[in-house]
């Protein structure tokens, strides 16, 4: 699973 940047937050 890749990390994504959403609303300035990094979610992995």
Swiss-Prot record:
Keyword Secreted annotated: yes
Location(s) in or outside the cell: Secreted
Principal subcellular localisation of the protein: secreted
Entry GO CC: extracellular region
Keywords: Secreted
UniProt tissue specificity: Expressed by the skin glands.
Protein name: Skin secreted peptide 3
Source organism per UniProt: Ascaphus truei
């Amino acid at each position: 699973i890749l990390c994504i940047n959403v609303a300035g937050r990094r979610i992995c």
